Amino acid sequence: MINHFKPALLMLLVWTLITGVFYPVLVTHLGQLLFPRQANGSLIEKDGKVLGSELIGQPFGDPRYFWGRPSATAPHAYNAGASSGSNQGPTNPALLAAIKSRVQALRNADPGNTAPVPVDLVTASGSGLDPHISPAAAAYQAARVARLRNLSLPVVEDLVKRYTEGRQFGFLGEPRVNVLKLNLALDALR
């Protein structure tokens, strides 16, 4: 009877070592060798201090900064350990109330802006951690940021254009703006 189990146990051991030890070690070392910055989280540093990751959104509540997409990672915004969507359907009263509240907050921050609010400023992404907004969402906020920083609108609009990333590989997704990079560039203008 034990002879019937030997091959199965041996295969279990072999595949456990291959898929549980050798493959992860190989991929980790290849990642560190070929893509060290990305393998370590695409961190953005200044003077040896980590400011954030270009892959994870961050909360910016100060109206002098561009704001990112809302985070769905309650109770703490942009918590990678709680990454998920809100799972609220389009007719869910809680989602509709949250959207209305977010629209009102945007209107309160910039009362003179009567343009339609871009959808990505009031809805969370699928992961709840998206670091990007659309160029339209950045353009919507540009006048507020320029006014509160005493900058001319063309200067801020030019910065948005410079930090707008194209479609991935030229055809995947939509153009996007990394909010952290854009806000750091704003701070560098001082």
From Swiss-Prot:
Classification via NCBIfam families: kdpC (TIGR00681), PRK00315.1 (NF001454)
Which PANTHER family does the protein's record reference?
Answer: POTASSIUM-TRANSPORTING ATPASE C CHAIN, POTASSIUM-TRANSPORTING ATPASE KDPC SUBUNIT
Q: Which organism is it from?
A: Methylococcus capsulatus (strain ATCC 33009 / NCIMB 11132 / Bath)
One GO CC term, this protein: plasma membrane
Regions that span the bilayer: 7-27
The answer to keyword Magnesium applying to this record is: no
Subunit annotation: The system is composed of three essential subunits: KdpA, KdpB and KdpC.
Q: Provide the protein name.
A: Potassium-transporting ATPase KdpC subunit
Please describe what this protein does: Part of the high-affinity ATP-driven potassium transport (or Kdp) system, which catalyzes the hydrolysis of ATP coupled with the electrogenic transport of potassium into the cytoplasm. This subunit acts as a catalytic chaperone that increases the ATP-binding affinity of the ATP-hydrolyzing subunit KdpB by the formation of a transient KdpB/KdpC/ATP ternary complex.
Q: Which gene encodes it?
A: kdpC
The record's comment on protein family reads: Belongs to the KdpC family.
Q: Which InterPro entries match?
A: KdpC (IPR003820)
Q: Which residues form a coiled coil?
A: none
Q: Which domain of life is it from?
A: Bacteria
Pfam families linked to this entry: KdpC (PF02669)
